[in-house]
Design a protein with these regions (language model features):
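Short amphipathic alpha-helix with an adjacent loop that forms part of the alpha/beta core around
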Residues: 7-13
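A short beta-strand-loop structural module common to alpha/beta enzyme folds
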Residues: 1-7, 54
């Protein structure tokens, strides 16, 4: 479910919990941190997994939990240690972005040597890695 609706979920009824969060403008949604903080006691009683989706992970040296800056920051801020972690690269869908978002993302891609053609969509997700993560979690 969306993070906005997750606060209504009774976590006690589940044996496994998976939380995923994407990066927008260099940050995870603050509600993800709030959710973890409020539910930390319950999360620590369960088998849990966390994954982050960010385009930085398109680079081989930043596509693992221990090398991805956003994962490292999430773990530091949240003070939560899920049983399983994963990092996925996601995609850039320039045509679907608003003008300002497209410019900002294009600039970020330019300075990080990523794709900058705003007429294109770029898929960086390693779907085999996603499927493997799902198998390991479930």
């Amino acid at each position: 479910c969306k993070i906005e609706n997750a606060f209504e979920v009774d976590l006690a009824q589940y044996t496994k919990i998976v939380i995923g969060a994407s990066i927008r403008y260099g940050k995870h949604n603050p509600l993800v941190y709030e959710f973890v903080k409020i539910n930390k006691d319950e999360l620590e009683k369960k088998q849990t997994a966390f994954f982050t989706v960010n385009v930085v992970a398109r680079k081989k040296e930043k596509n693992k939990p221990d090398t991805n800056p956003y994962m490292k920051k999430f773990l530091e801020i949240s003070d939560w240690r899920p049983n399983k972690l994963a990092v996925f690269a996601g995609r850039i869908d320039y045509p679907s972005y608003r003008f300002f978002d497209r410019l900002i993302i294009r600039f970020i891609m330019f300075i990080t040597k990523g794709p900058t053609d705003t007429m294109q969509t770029y898929e960086f997700t390693d779907w085999k890695k996603v499927k493997q993560f799902a198998k390991e979690v479930f």
